[in-house]
Structure formats: structure tokens, C-alpha cells
Amino acid sequence: MEVANKTQQKHFVLVHGAGHGAWCWYKLKLLLESSGHKVTAIDLATSGANPKRLDEVDTLKDYCSPLLELMAAIPQDDKVILVGHSYGGFCIALAMDLYPKKISIGVFVASVMPDSTHPPNYFINQYYKWNPVGEDSTDTKVETFGDPDQPRTVIHFGPIYLSTKLYQNCTSEEIELAKFLLRPLSVFSNDLSKLKAFSEEGYGSVRRGYIMCSEDKAVPAGLQHWLIENVGASEVKEIKGADHMPMISKPQELCQCLVEITEKVV
């Protein structure tokens, strides 16, 4: 892969999925930087090394606050490429809605990708339609806490679920790393149920790309195709042999897809 010069250099902002952190991008970050690009990988609230606890974060916006703070600090004449993985698709969609002029393209990787017609919760329901609760969930645990009238849900990915549904094409060492670093997660369903659709003038004005993973067992191929057909993306790529974690199982291929997408649109 050619090394980008200063005029070709792009700024990639990498946004992890639920339960993960900036750490999961360690291979891709090095590859993009080696190609001459600038990379920022962030820890969302309650994730990675972020000190927030789940009982301190109530909303999607709270969860995304590190990303939104980063976007607010970017100069008005600069543009970044947002890359959102899995649940991180909601996070980059929120940033695209609030800061559309600071974003060249939002790239969704094996991710939920909302539109500007339906509220976010609609896409959570679509996910469960394609991937029913309890189906192949193996040892993943779901707990509730807080107000009994509006309980908060916490999800703990179990080691069997990790190795068979998320990381099945990764090495045993990579799976062990994930077991050490993953944190309990929430999808903030109470908040999502109250949110309106992202706006057409904000989110809808930013180009979207989608990277499919052919062997993803967490976001099924049928759902990925449905999102592309019904929501739409100007650039679509597929990584053959990639599980739900292409940044770990297929980092070279993911890097190539991102570079090719951005070369077309930026």
C-alpha cells in the first residue's frame, strides 16, 4: 500500500462497538498510520480505559460524549472520516447529525446503520428480527439494575459467545486479549425508545459507506444486505472470510477497504 503524502493524508476517527474500546483497533491504527494517515481511536464512556461506570451513563449522547467532544474540538475547515463498528454505528450517526460539515464520510463496519426516517430504536428492533434474543446467545448474560419501572439492562459477553460468534476467525491469543479487556455494556434501550430519527439536513447530508463481513455471526449477512438496500450507502465493500471483528481477523483487508472508499469520495 502506498504511503500518502501530506495532501493525501486523511484523518480517520475509529469508534468501537459495544463492550469494546480503542484497544480493538490496534492493528488497523498501525496500518493506517504506516500508510501516512492520521488516526484517532477513542474510548467511549464506560468503555476501554474510560473511567465512567454504567450507572453514571444514561443516554446514547452520554455514551458518545468522548466522540462528540473530539468533534467539537476539530477546526471548522477540517474534515474527518468516521469509522463505526457494530453498535458504534449509532455513535457515528449521532456525530454526523451534529457535525455534518466536519465529516467527509461515515463508514459503517459490520454495523447498525440508521436512516433519517425511522427512530434509532427501529433499527434495534430490526436487529432482533434478524437475530432473535436468546438465539445462539450461549453464555452471554443479561442483567437489570436501577429503577424497577425503567430498569437498565447490562449485557456481559461470555467467553463461548466471544469465541464462536464474535471472534471465531481470530487466534486464541486474540480471543484471550478480548476476555481481559471487554467491559459490560448497555444498548441504552430506554433512551433509544425516546429518540427521534436523525435529521436529513444533518446525518442525511453526509455520505455513507458500508463494509460487510462475509462470516459475521453477530450482525447477520441478511441484516447487512437489508441495511444497504433500505438505508443506502454510496460505497459498499465486502471482506471475505471476516468475522464480526475484521479489525482483528482481517486488518489488512479492512485497511485496504477504508483507503479505497476514501480515495473515491474525499
Curated annotation (Swiss-Prot):
Active site: S86, D216, H244
Top EC group: hydrolase
Pathway(s) served: Alkaloid biosynthesis
Any one GO molecular-function label of the UniProt entry: methyl jasmonate esterase activity
Catalytic activity: 17-dehydropreakuammicine + H2O = norfluorocurarine + methanol + CO2
AB hydrolase-1 domain: residues covered: 11-121
Entry EC no(s): 3.1.1.123
Keyword match ATP-binding: no
GO biological process: alkaloid biosynthetic process; jasmonic acid metabolic process; salicylic acid metabolic process
Gene3D superfamilies with a match to the protein in the record: alpha/beta hydrolase
UniProtKB keywords: Alkaloid metabolism, Hydrolase, Serine esterase
Purpose: Hydrolase involved in the biosynthesis of curare monoterpene indole alkaloids (MIAs), natural products such as diaboline, a pharmacologically active compound used to regulate blood pressure. Curare alkaloids act as animal glycine receptor antagonists. Catalyzes the conversion of dehydropreakuammicine to norfluorocurarine.
Protein family: Belongs to the AB hydrolase superfamily.
Assembly and interaction partners: Homodimer.
Name used for this protein in its record: Norfluorocurarine synthase 2
Organism: Strychnos sp
